Amino acid sequence: MAQGSRRRKVVLTAGSEGWSPSSGPDMEELLRSVERDLNIDARQLALAPGGTHVVALVSTRWLASLRERRLGPCPRAEGLGEAEVRTLLQRSVQRLPPGWTRVEVHGLRKRRLSYPLGGGVPFEEGSCSPETLTRFMQEVAAQNYRNLWRHAYHTYGQPYSHSTAPSALPALDSIRQALQRVYGCTFLPVGESIPCLSNVRDGPCPSRGSPACPSLLRAEALLESPEMLYVVHPYVQFSLHDVVTFSPAKLTNSQAKVLFLLFRVLRAMDACHRQGLACGALSLHHIAVDEKLCSELRLDLSAYEMPSEDENQEGSEEKNGTGIKSEKEGEGRTECPTCQKELRGLVLDWVHGRISNFHYLMQLNRLAGRRQGDPNYHPVLPWVVDFTTPYGRFRDLRKSKFRLNKGDKQLDFTYEMTRQAFVAGGAGSGEPPHVPHHISDVLSDITYYVYKARRTPRSVLCGHVRAQWEPHEYPATMERMQTWTPDECIPEFYTDPSIFCSIHPDMPDLDVPAWCSSNQEFVAAHRALLESWEVSQDLHHWIDLTFGYKLQGKEAVKEKNVCLHLVDAHTHLTSYGVVQLFDQPHPQRLAGSPALAPEPPLIPRLLVQPIREATGQEDISGQLINGAGRLVVEATPCETGWTRDRPGTGEDDLEQATEALDSISLPGKAGDQPGSSSSQASPGLLSFSAPSGSRPGRRSKAAGLDPGEGEEGKIVLPEGFSPIQALEELEKVGNFLAKGLGSQLEEPEKPHAQPPVHLQSLFHRDMQVLGVLLAEMVFATRVRILQPDAPLWVRFEAVRGLCIRHSKDIPVSLQPVLDTLLQLSGPKSPMVSKKGKLDPLFEYRPVSQGLPPPSPAQLLSPFSSVVPFPPYFPALHKFILLYQARRVEDEVQGRELAFALWQQLGAVLNDITPEGLEILLPFVLSLMSEEHTAVYTAWYLFEPVAKALGPKNANKYLLKPLIGAYESPCRLHGRFYLYTDCFVAQLVVRLGLQAFLTHLLPHVLQVLAGVEASQEEGKGLVGTTEDEESELPVSGPGSCAFGEEIQMDGQPAASSGLGLPDYRSGVSFHDQADLPDTEDFQAGLYVAESPQPQEAEAVSLGQLSDKSSTSEASQGEERGGDDGGAPADKNSVKSGDSSQDLKQSEGSEEEEEEEGCVVLEEDQEDEVTGTSELTLSDTMLSMETVVAPGDGRDREEEEEPLTEQTEGKEQKILLDTACKMVRWLSAKLGPTVASRHVARNLLRLLTSCYVGPTRQQFTVSSDDTPPLNAGNIYQKRPVLGDIVSGPVLSCLLHIAYLYGEPVLTYQYLPYISYLVAPGSNSNPSRLNSRKEAGLLAAVTLTQKIIVYLSDTTLMDILPRISHEVLLPVLGFLTSFVTGFPSGAQARTVLCVKTISLIALICLRIGQEMVQQHLSEPVATFFQVFSHLHELRQQDLPLDPKGCTEGQLPEATFSDGQRRPVDPTLLEELQKVFTLEMAYTIYVPFSCLLGDIIRKIIPNHELVGELAGLYLESMSPSSRNPASMEPTMASAGPEWDPQSGSCLQDDGHSGTFGSVLVGNRIQIPDSQPQSPGPLGSLSGVGSSGGLSNRNEDNALKRELPRSAHGLSGNWLAYWQYEIGVSQQDAHFHFHQIRLQSFPGHTGAVKCVAALSSEDFFLSGSKDRTVRLWPLYNYGDGTNETASRLIYAQHRKSVFYVGQLEAPQYVVSCDGAVHVWDPFTGKTLRTVDPSDSRVPLTAVAVMPAPHTSITMASSDSTLRFVDCRKPGLQHEFRLGGGLNPGLVRSLAVSPSGRSVVAGFSSGFMVLLDTRTGLVLRGWPAHEGDILQIKAVEGSVLISSSSDHSLTVWKELEQKPTHHYKSASDPIHTFDLYGSEVVTGTVANKIGVCSLLEPPSQATTKLSSENFRGTLTSLALLPTKRHLLLGSDNGIIRLLA
């Protein structure tokens, strides 16, 4: 115990002077009790900063046993030193060692609970039934009746009544029972064995785990000892006080967040009151919050303790008499009683010199919340001298230490650079903004540890300062320390001599300056310098910089003191930062003003002549306090930044003047006053320090006077003498106190009697406490002047005064509740009547405004108007409770939770506002970022949440977690949900097509390349992390690592590569322009009819173009696959959670037809194959089915090495679903977009399939067959990468099926050429791994392409294949200077693949064509054997002649050429080009080429000999190699002795009428279904684990003819588009006609494309609206029929558009129709109120809004919400003018403003939130034809005056003005920053919004467009134009 007591003493006295909690003995008693009763080592205990409870560091096992009601000794933290444990107990420290956690122990002393406690309301349970208005009114009436009766009885009846007092329980029993009911567990006896009364008296208690309210901070355990009651809580990391103090931006601009906090607090208080428990004197510290602002209430049980009279007396004596211990253990001294005073008293005491500088600064640190020993938030004091000279030179306290250290130039540079970055970043970028600032921190944790390095363990220093231990790099002297640091000083350098003494053997002690003989002397001298006159006079400037008004605003910028923490508006929670205490200039210390000195200054009657002054110095040792620093200042040149850059003070001038006066020789006075100079110079100086005496060292010499000038007798005041100085200083102090501290006079207390404590009065006190707490939250910056432990009545009076004086600062939503709780208004405002610990502050009136005194239940009632809680709060609260209650440990529970939340989400979103979404969104994002819930949350919740957010916010907040879910390295069960076509359709609709293609599609496609590729591909595709070989890496890709967000409670998690924001940084829409404020017509973001669940699944219909998995197209694909021999396909997808059941088929006949034409031909593929001479395969399996080719069982066996952690079945389902989705998406996007985005990404992915040595291993079977001898030469010999690349190749070839052969020749082949092209540098170098993989991918893809090329096409591009593909590949393969990263293995694989490719081409084109076109590649390949043979056999010497450093030696070969040779690569080449390789290539090529081999290959004899040698080594008894060719011709077993596969397997070899069988060429018989050659080919699978996919052995296959095949204009346009850079921001119009859409019988009045760009709408004079598909057909001359016709209009339709959120169509013919584009059903019709006043213009609000704005002919603007009946708003636009009819309306992209254009050319801008007209101006001289609004508050208008004008919303002059020469621009659309215009003269123009006015105009030819142009719409992603004409035909042009 002695050791424990000593340790505890260290903890208790760790605070500096004035630093310990208010009730030291009480807290010390609590510490002792916890140590004794809970068996926790004293080292592991510490007091909480407020002194209200004890924080304990305990092991998680001990805590788990405590939860199970077993209490044993808590293990000690053996591996941690005392300093480390002390650091771990600090609030700002969040990372704890594994196996350890922190808890809070709250204690109640039983002896203080001995008073009786009167019963209030009986214990009652909350009702489960919803509250009704009738019930609410009944309860109010009954309570009013009871209260009025009781009030009357106490007033009139009780004085005359002699009835006995009602019985009351002892407070101890009442509290014990209430705690058990509230926390749902019983007390566990601890300490000495005692009879636990709770089990006897309390009756049944709830079972463990059922607390009364989830909004209460849960209790880990309730413990009872003979003397104490304990409540053990989990540690609270952040409180509401931290939010309002350090992260106020988290609550800024959102009243809903504050109200939701209040809502949860009231829920908790209501639960406590129902159980008979008061909450105590709550403060902001008692409300625990997390990053999601989910609050939990921590009760203040100490309020129940009633101190006895003796303790009261002791407490007062202690408070008034004793001080607080100093940090030094042995030194205990008293301090003045102002430690507990409010800030006003502290300021006055310091100003008047009654307390020291040190004590005052420590109190300011305490008020700012700084905590002793906290490395992140330790107290700070100023450095005052620089230690360079004896007693140092004083620093300039007008500048921060950071500024003095860094210099003004660097700070200006930092501020300017961050300011420019902030301006450049703007609101549109996703990256965290760069905020202009000068200073990052006042005292960083690194500086703190460097300061205390001598006393801090080495492990801690290595963890925080520098990982490598370098003791000599730490500053060795105080002078070096002070010079090095940019941060301020710490109190230890003023108080603790031990800080200089090192505990490390290899680190010397910190040296004190040479002018001090010991550490103790330095500390005393340093402290004296802090208290010196020079420091005191300027200390107020330092306070202004560190705690005062110079921290923010213009003053901060002027003083270069803008602190990052105060201006970055961070929303992550933190428990430390920079706190501003004062917003007014701090008064200066009054150090004996000469104006009010005890003696008046001598005023001479003679004019003073110029005086020469001489100063001297004397020894000043021992007189530092009396102004020694001042003498040092005079003796030392003031040249550095440490000197003051201001003129001498009035004190200096006064001294000089008085010394001169003393030396003046007056008649009879000369020399009479030798000491007057010193006595007058310092009257009252340093009144707080040692007794002042005469200032030493001052000697003055008098100057002579001219006697003739002394007779006038003028009165001369001393220079600097100001008689009103005292008045000015008094006024400054008064202003500071009034404005900065808001102090007021105190009224004397009146004695009052102490009535008995009643529970009801405690409940009333709780409500008053709640009012105080709310007011403190509102006035957080103004109540910092209160002491942290101020009593409740002090807090109440402070906030009550603030509420009355600053009522306008109170948010409107909180004004009624504050008025009710604190009784601010009324006939007489309450004053504090009782100041007892258990007394209410004042008595509530029995009935106020018809309601009883406030209670939590009353405030929570929806029928009470006291707090305007939004209607969605209960549903939101229920949603959050469900989220918190469910513990998810596996995917099954994750799915159940996501489904349960989805069921409740509809009720939440029905009435939610943008502010409510800010509260909800972090919970959804958290679910989407956690491993077990990510997939199911995305599946269930993405659609409704993204619908409510709108596209802009959905991209901002949901994109990152979606990327994380797609990139997760773990095999998540059900992951295939994310790859279903219906889910991807939702992504396209809710994120926007362009955003989906740019940001998400690359991540979606990565699954096709396997799990490992999704990480490797990050390098080449989306820039994520490096590849990892492990199947389950510790952390996922950089964009989102599961669990990362929840492991660390502190700093925000790192952003992804896209710079997307993390939800931990807070969700706030206020800085955007896409979500409105909470006005009525935009307050809710409604969801359309909630889809009904199908088999417990969320069904969400995407949009019209979604092709369902159960559509005929998909079924046709499946049929094709099944017929082709993959029976497992359907069953595998159907197993488990099949997407077949999740989406209803909504595709119409045309959709099915357009896909069906492809499917039909795929289904007929068997017949085509059978009758073709040119194809060997009888099915198209891998290309037509999503499943990987072959039967499912074999495929799974092949993939097992890749997916050791998963079942092959899940992987198969995943790939199946993903491939189907890619096929669907490729058809949906159209040829140009599919090629630009899908095909390009797939081509990049193909390379990733071969990266790494693992992917380059041949697949082998159980026998040891060498892979080189397996099968025919042109057959595929798969490596692992071939298996992985199967789905990628399948999807690539499907795009070729859709759009035809040009995809192969114009897109794939150029990319292959790019992959194999040699590097730009001339010097040969080693390949990188990605280039190596690219070569393998290129050869593999080329082999696939060759099979599908027609004969004509193949011969046309054969020269390109030879020169751009084969020769570059052979150049790498046969190079003597280029090495492969994977060595011989990669070169061998490339060699085998290249042989197969060349052989395939040879078989396709025949011998003659080989000689004509392929002789060079074949010869080049064979030549390498000769070169190697010469180097090996003849030992050809390498010629070093002429080789300079860095050059390779060269060798001369038999052909006479000299070639460089890298000697280090010879071994690699010899491993590749072996005898076996020679045999493998020579035999088939000799058969393929016959006699031509002698002409093509000069060294064929050498290669033949090498092949013979290999044959001899394999079978020595074989025949002579010379007879090899006849041998090959006759038999064929020699081809592969092990496998038995013979060369006759070659089958049909040529495509020019000849077929090779063995080495004989013959014309084959037609054998459509003959299994002969196919059967032998299939046997290859037994030789090397090869795939038995028949199509891999095909020489030629026909591409099915698709309805979407490119030809004519479509082909020309597609060829152009794939060559255009994706970064090209300009719109190019080439007038290429792509499609026609006839159908309307009248002129087309309006055209509008849907956001997904696969359908568009048109309205016509024929009173119909038509829906058209946008899929490509034919050659540009095809005509497409409409998909749906809406014919409910009665007049000409002049407007059509789409409401994005609900996906409804809005059309107008004078009345507005809202209808469903899926069914054509009318949902709503809005007719004009007066038929004579029709609607003339319509516009829809952008997502997420569902409002429609309409203008009528009477210049009235009306808003309609399609979800609600009736009108929302009605605004008049005319304003008394007669501007004419409204011709056009446009809504800003944010939805915050709408602009109307009139027929008179007038334009009006209206704020949609307030209805106020922001601006009205005459914009044009003629009729306004069209208006559009763009991001950045830009408006574009066109008029009949031939002009197109670009405006800024609130600027008077236009930014650009375009004038059309001949015709007005009557229609236009936007493409990025360009405007595409159309005129009635059929001219299309393109002009820029950014550049000076210039316009490119194109006249539409009559061949491409007939009629007159009436309307125009642009497809921005596809870059197409839809043009409507007056003849009813719409044309698609590009």
From Swiss-Prot:
Chief place where the protein resides: membrane
SUPFAM superfamilies named among the record's database cross-references: BEACH domain (SSF81837), Protein kinase-like (PK-like) (SSF56112), WD40 repeat-like (SSF50978)
Bias (Polar residues) ranges: 1102-1114
Topology of the protein relative to the lipid bilayer: Peripheral membrane protein
Keywords of this entry: Cytoplasm, Cytoplasmic vesicle, Endosome, Lysosome, Membrane, Mitochondrion, Repeat, Transit peptide, WD repeat
GO terms, biological process: aggrephagy; early endosome to late endosome transport; mitochondrion organization; protein stabilization; ubiquitin-dependent protein catabolic process
Cystine pairs: none
Gene from which the chain derives: Wdr81
Record InterPro entries: BEACH_dom, BEACH_dom_sf, Kinase-like_dom_sf, WD40/YVTN_repeat-like_dom_sf, WD40_repeat_dom_sf, WD40_rpt, WDR81
Biased composition (Low complexity): 673-695, 1566-1580
Record region (Necessary and sufficient for the interaction with SQSTM1): 1-645
Segments of skewed composition (Basic residues): 1-10
Known tissue expression: Expressed in brain, Purkinje cells of cerebellum, retinal photoreceptor cells and spinal cord (at protein level). In brain, specifically expressed by neuronal cells (at protein level). Detected in a wide range of tissues including intestine, adipose tissue, liver, pancreas, thymus, spleen, kidney, heart, eye, sciatic nerve, and testis.
Segments of this protein annotated with the region Disordered: 1-26, 305-336, 665-717, 1018-1044, 1092-1175, 1187-1209, 1515-1544, 1562-1599
Result of knocking out the encoding gene: Brain-specific, conditional knockout mice are born at the expected Mendelian frequency, but most of them die a few hours after birth. If they show no overt brain morphological abnormalities, a neuronal accumulation of SQSTM1 in foci is observed.
Family, as annotated: Belongs to the WD repeat WDR81 family.
GO function terms (MF aspect): K63-linked polyubiquitin modification-dependent protein binding; phosphatidylinositol 3-kinase inhibitor activity
Bias-annotated ranges (Acidic residues): 1147-1168
Species of provenance: Mus musculus (Mouse)
Residue ranges, compositional bias (Basic and acidic residues): 316-334, 1589-1599
GO cellular component, one term: cytosol
Domain BEACH: 335-612
Assembly behavior: Interacts with WDR91; involved in early to late endosome cargo transport. Interacts with BECN1; negatively regulates the PI3 kinase/PI3K activity associated with endosomal membranes. Interacts with SQSTM1; the interaction is direct and regulates the interaction of SQSTM1 with ubiquitinated proteins. Interacts with MAP1LC3C; recruits MAP1LC3C to ubiquitinated protein aggregates in the aggrephagy process.
Protein name: WD repeat-containing protein 81
Placement of WD repeats on the sequence: 1639-1678, 1685-1725, 1777-1816, 1819-1857, 1904-1934
Gene3D superfamilies per record: BEACH domain, YVTN repeat-like/Quinoprotein amine dehydrogenase
Domain of life: Eukaryota
